[in-house]
């Protein structure tokens, strides 16, 4: 290398003395003129459009590039499938970003919405095509593995001065994750205790709006961060594995099937001394450069069998190491001997149902499509006919409802996304089309707290059960008094609270879920509410009535006079 001889190494594993420029940036290494040397050169080797010839070239990371192209962060398959499933009347369509990049038009309103409102966040998107947060997104491999590109771009190449090449790293900073994961489920914000507020910019600071701002003219309030962030000082990569983030080589239609990590992977760990897992641990530890080298320790495995190289066990002692600085954390493993973990009837409850401190919830948002306007299509980069406008109703964070996740049976916190949609090509009012669709999703809100919900918070809160904000009357549920959001006062012809999934009889008011996620059934609600009759007095997990609650329930229903609660009632 004779032209750019004063350039820093991207990292210890890609020294310029060995790689030069052309191995990553292409071009002609044998040319003697600048024009010829730069012919065919690429600025971003991580761009998925060229990655097969750069990062994925022979002897480099070919298998990883193939995995990334099939992963949901490149395909957006989960977003596309969910969006179409929520758009009433549309048939499922299996597609992905790479296929859509070759199409000039949307085909239907759902795809037009995706192209103009969602498609600025995927790994096929060119990096630095704008001067805002959206411009920082995309770029294939570089989206995650380049940490300081902004500073590097600001540099000018000056003869005789060292040019600081953007650094490559496997110690991916959480900022690289949050630049994308701050919309929709907003888990990147929630994890660090940031709750996106209603958008008023309050509380005001002097004569101006609040300085706690997010991209897109949004604001946030400080809430309790996830305990892994506040106490453990852990980054996203400390839990989320490379196999999970970059994909496992399979094409997944939703993010759930690509996920690899679980609470149990660390808190009910399974360790291995298998040669293959130990070899993977040694290799990943060497690339990380912060996590200590294993000294004969067993390594933990995820549900897919991925080696968690930063979680190890030796002589009964479990050690977790942060990937950013190698800091050691003593893990508290799960104990089924604790009465609250082995309580009969709680077998289906997920960790998140009890230990999530709060969860973003959106109600009453309005989506308008105007044929007369124009808006940029993120996939073509050019404006096209039709413009979308989003208006929010109200957001909440407290007491998320619980329900059943997907086609399984586990109880999870539910987050709604309620959108009213108006579209009429003639600009006329359309009546007689009732709105009864509330999209719900069950996921980990990333607001883990060591203290769990109390018994009454689950068994005695109508909102948690799916009835919306209200109050209990004995063993039944009344309507909210007043409702959190009065739909009729806002011009919506609805006779139920917007935050209610069920009416007082347990009948479904509004629901839409592409994966089978649902609120509790009438029978499940009745079972949950019956416990609420008891927890006022029997408020300890170890109380003897819970050892065989079915028997206790039968004794109560039979009117057994020896029971203190019935004797007091009869007296």
Where in this protein do the model-derived segments appear?
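C-type cytochrome heme-c attachment and multiheme electron-transfer modules
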Residues: 1-10, 16-130, 148-150, 166-571
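Short helix-terminating capping/connector loops at secondary-structure junctions
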Residues: 14-15, 134-136
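Long, hydrophobic, well-ordered secondary-structure blocks that form the structural core
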Residues: 135-165
